[in-house]
Each structure stands twice: as C-alpha cells, then as structure tokens.
Amino acid sequence: MPIQSSKQHSAAPVAMDTQNDGRSFKEIRQDCLQRQVLFEDPDFPADDSALFYSKSPPLAFEWKRPGELCDNPRFVVGDANRTDICQGQLGDCWLLAATASLTLQKKNLARVVPRDQEFDNSYAGVFHFQFWQHNKWLDVVVDDRLPTVRNKLVMLHSASNNEFWSALLEKAYAKLHGSYESLKGGSTMEAMEDFTGGVGEMYETKSAPKKLFTIMKKALDRSSMMGCSIDISSSAESEAQTSSGLVKGHAYSITGLEEVNCRGRKVQLIRIRNPWGTVEWNGPWSDSSKEWSQVDKADKDRILKHSDDGEFWMEFEDFKSNYDKVEICNLTPDSLVENTPHHWEVSWFEGNWIRGSTAGGCRNYIDTFWTNPQFKLTLEDTDDDDDVCSVVIALMQKNRRLLRKEGMDMETIGFAVYEAPDDVDQLGKDFFRYNGSKARSRTYVNVREVSERFTLPPGNYLVVPTTFQPHHEADFLIRVFSEKKATALEMGSEVDADLPDPPMPSSPDEETEEEKGLRRLFDQLSGSDQAISARELQQMLNGVLSRRKEVKFDGLTLNTCHSIINLMDVDNTGQLEFQEFKVFWEKMKKWIMLFLSFDTDRSGKMSSYELRIALKAAGMQLNSKLLQLLGLRFADENFDIDFDDYLTCIVRLENMFRVFQSLDTKKSGRVNMNIMQFLMMSMNV
C-alpha cells in the first residue's frame, strides 16, 4: 500500500475493536450486566487450545476466575508498578521485562491497561487491553478465567495474591498471538513496541558507542523503555545462573541510571530489574555491598529509597562487561507522553514477499534480488545540529507468532539502502550488480524487527527489504523515523500500457514468402468461410511452432487460442480471418523473441521473477500486487512459466488493457460500467 506519514504531536489514534462479532468491550460488559452473566470469550476459549498448540498441557490446568481464588479480587492494588509482575511457568520473561518498564511510563501504562475496569459493581467477567500491532492500535477483550494448578496462578501473576491486572494483561497478549505457548521466547523490544508503538534500537555493549551511558540516560529521560540481556552460546545455557548472580538468556529491564560521588570520583551506576524478583547481582554495588558505605549519604538515601526486591545496582563498566545487549524503545509522536524534548517524523508502508514474484532474497541471490519490493526515500533537510540527516529504518515482519501453530516462525530478514538515480522506477538486476549499498542492516536475523540508525547526506535513496533466502514468504511493515520530514514513494507501483495501434496488414501481392506460406496453411484449414476457429488456430500454430526448434513447448492449449481470437477478432465473429491472423503473427514473432531472451537454457520455461521485465518490454507495466497474482496464476512449483502460459498471460493482459482503454474515453484511468458491461468484458478476455 502507499506510504503514509505521521505528523508531529498527532493525537493518539483510537484503538480498533477485535472481537469476531464486532462488539466493543463496553458493549460486551453492558450486555453481560443486563443478562446477569459472566463473560465467556468465544474467540479465546478457556481450554487447552489457548495454552498450547504443539503439545498437550504437562499438568491438569483448571481455569478459574479471580473471585474463585481469593475473597477480595482487585484489578490493581494501589498503583500498578514493577513489583506487580512475577514470572510463572511460561518462558516469556521478555514480556515481563517490558511490562516492568511499562509501569514506569504512567501515561503509556494507562493506554495499555485501561483503568475503566474493576471487580466492583461494573464487573462482568470481561476485561480489555490495548496493544500496537503493525501501525494500528487494537483493543483486545478477554474473560477473566485464568489457568491454575491447586488454586494458584501458574502464568504471570502479581506478588499480591488479590491483584490480577498483570495476569489478565498476559492473557490478552496471548490471545493476540493465538496462545500462551506462542509467547515462549522473544525480545523485550518486541513487547516494548507493542506497548508504545515506538521504534526499537539495539546496542552490543562490547562494541557500543563511547557515549552509551549518555545515550541511555537521555533515552530514559525521554521516557524510552529499555531492556538488556546476556547472550547464550547454546540452548543448554538458557536461564543458567552465573557466579555473580546474573541469568543468561534472560530478559532484564533497565529502570534507572545515576552518577554518584564515591571517594572523590564520579561513578556511573545502572539499576536493573530481574522479573523473577529473586536472583540478583552479587558483585560491586549490589545490595549491602561495601561500596554503598563510601557514597555520600544524600546520594545513597535518594538512590536506594526506591529499589525493590529483584532490582539491583551495578557499576556501568561492570554492566558492559557482563551484559551483551541493550534494547531501547523510542516513542513515536502519537505517544501519550507529554513534553518530551524530541519527536520523530514517521513514514511507513506495508508490503509482502511472495514466492515467484517479490520474494527475491538477499544480495547473494543477484538474479532475483532486484525483484524485492523497493521504495524511494528522499531526505532534503539536515538535522538542526549537523549537515547530515538522521534516520532510523525499521523492518518488521507481521503475524509470525500467530502463524507458529501453522508451522511457521520468524523469517531471517534485513534490508539495504542504495543511492537512487533520479526519475527511475523499479530498478533492475544490472543496477544492483554494479552499485554497492550506501547503508544496510548489520546482519540478517530471525527476529520480528530489524532496525538501524543512520546518518546520511541529503539525497534520494532506495530501500530494499528482503528475506535472507529467496522464495520465502512473509508480510512486512517498514517504518522510517527521521528528525526532519522525509518523503517516500513505493517503486514499481505504476500500472500502465503503451500499446500502439496494430499495423495495417500487407496486401496479398505484397506478402512475404513467410506470409505466403502461412496463407497456404490457413486456406487448408479455413475452408469456404475463409476464417479459422480456435481449434483450427490451435492446429495451425502448433504445426508452425513445432518446426521452430528454438521454441520448446508441449503445444498451445485451446484456452490460449480462444484468448488469441478474443484479442484479434475485431468484427466479433469468434473466428480469425487471414488479415487478422497476419497482424497477430507479427505480434507473435516479437513475443517469441522476448520469451527466448529469458529462456536462456532453452528449457521452454522462463522464471516468473522476470515477468515484470518481459511485460514491460511488451509495453505493459504492472505493480507488485498484480505481478504476485500473475505468478500465482501462471508459475509452477519451481517458479517457472512455460511458453503456453506465458503466451496466455501476455495475450490476456493486452486484451484487458485495450478493452479498458476503449472504455476510458477521457483518459482518466477510471471507467464506470454496469454488470452487463463487466460480464461482457470478462467473457471476452
């Protein structure tokens, strides 16, 4: 779809209702209150299908409402805060770490966790939460039946036995992705973005900029959400505890950054929270360590006053030595946080990689790389404090958690940025063969989103998002964040045809030897009516083409010959006269040469990825969506198109363009037609 832009300081968009029956949270609650029943969600039933998709539950779970687990259930006790979040049996610590960070952003929290719900007179067993998904805010409704074992919650829960907002939040997020199991394994950044609509950045601590502490401090001051983790070298190391009390492969949230005076020197400290709340750092600056006795009392009282169980301080240099990754989620202009000193300009567009047409793979696959979706980015104004343009480009694949139950997981994705020539549409293979990228994602990786920050001179750029390997399908969203307004345009989006009027056929006494031979064959087949039917045309063309050894094919089908007659039969007799056939044969010879230019191995087939070039050479320009449909219609399982299907495709397209052009008398690109006209046109293609 076309690229969209988000203006600075735009109002927060309204969340879309997601229930299959179209009802909103308020409508469901009101209906249940009137009928005096508790809501049971038909879209996410309280059974094993909501828990696991790949196996049977390891335990006998019972689904119970909060009122069955305690005497005085509350949605939120006091204020929602990071101590309300305790990990359960599910491996979704990444979600817990993001939720802990969310509690520090009260206005964002109020959006994700609306406070218009409680266990009071308005209680009807229904709750709702709001998440950002692929450039839209969604309102997700759930009932309050939660999985338990022996009357205890087994998934995410609060430290307070009668508080349930965090458990219900996890259930709503599981519903969004199809099941609780779909939440196993992930990046803190993924949930941070879903809670804010923000854009993520990732830093490797061992190779981070020297000003990483300043970058993180400014990010926290701007209400950004942050997380960190320690890499693992094998699955056996996952959740393994180090001697210093840190857990590998575990998602932590970053909740504070401070500088303190210690024995006359400035020490940079970072506060980190473990969602488990039990295992903590035991090195320097840990709880009760000797370093705190050497800090100014005012600093110590101020810093330690708000630390909780599972939350610890460490020196920033120790942090960089022990942790491997830092994730920062920057907030977008429509965030609910006010008075932040920096706002982004945002452009975005959606697309997909489809086998046989737009799933070209990375630059390693040069023959198909150019077929990937392309879009042009124009940067005109430099940053206020520099002569370059700062941009963050984020490529996100869509709905992959939801598709896990169908055997699909994250694709390995990345992107490249090229300097774009002026006034050029979709760029072809030779451009990428001879021109290197100006910027690119650091690596291809199988995560939901890959993002990079660049500083580029003003100019025109081409962004090419890809999967690592060709023929891999996925839907994607690209967001471009720039300090100054940028313009973006999808390449290859034009649909047009340059089809000159067919030449006048030569008179009989001016016919070439080839035409005289075709006339003799035509006369043998046509009989007294001097015209041939589709079946006679099939016989004639198969006979003529079989003598051309360079064209390898199994014969034209009757369907193809009907399409040829529909294109060339100007007097609507359902047959071809020889003068009409001569005009067609001139077209046919050009189409044959075009096909052979792509059938380099003379197999009788061409790659469906090259259909865009072939059709453009024949005078027809299609966008990616139409090329995807043609690939699905005419290509085989190896993404090849044989000669008969190629001919059918090109004949039908030319016929459709010519019919449209005859109806578009004002050359406006639009036609109005009634059902009769539409059916007549469809039948004649």
How would you name each of these model-derived features?
Residues 600:
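Short, conserved catalytic or interaction motifs in soluble domains
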Residues 596:
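Inter-heme linker and motif-flanking segments adjacent to c-type heme-binding CXXCH motifs
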Residues 603:
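A contiguous pocket-lining binding segment that forms or flanks enzyme active sites
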Residues 1-563, 570-572, 578-582, 586-593, ...:
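Structured alpha-helical subdomains that flank or immediately precede key functional sites
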Residues 577, 607:
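Extracytoplasmic Gram-positive cell-surface binding/anchoring modules and repeats
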